[in-house]
Amino acid sequence: MLGTCLQNVREKGPLVHNITNYVTVNDVANVILACGASPIMSDEPQDVQDITAICGGLNINIGTLNVRTIEGMLAAGHKANELNHMVLLDPVGAGASSLRTNTAVNLMQEIKFDVIRGNISEIKTLAAGSGTTKGVDADVADAVTEENLDEAVAFAKAFSEKSGSIVAITGA
């Protein structure tokens, strides 16, 4: 299945709009290029609707938040939904601060996300509307182990159904 997805990306070569973490922006661009797509980065509210309109998808990463980026995320997300473009949310650090948690929850209320990816604590925070994380790492109490793997999978499936999104629990 992954091979088919990559083949489709290489054949279509979509432009992907990224409102992403300044720490990882270069890595994100290079991975998108390596997959056969083209990245474009813009978080300026006066620019994002035009950029989103010419793209095949939108990646929103809340790793470096400020008032301007939040405004840009909302504007781009609304435009992507209007155009039926794929939209992904990476709720980096949701649960670490009230700004991150409230922003992630608000984005989910305002924007239809096709995919939500995050560590287990970030996803639990989105599901409950509050939670804790160890910065950008999952809280130790949330660690997925052999013993609770079935429970974690059931949780991810339930949240996927509730949110209407594909849910990917990744990282530590």
Regions found by a protein language model. Give the residues of each.
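Conserved phosphate/ATP/ADP-binding segment of small-molecule kinases
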Residues: L99-A172
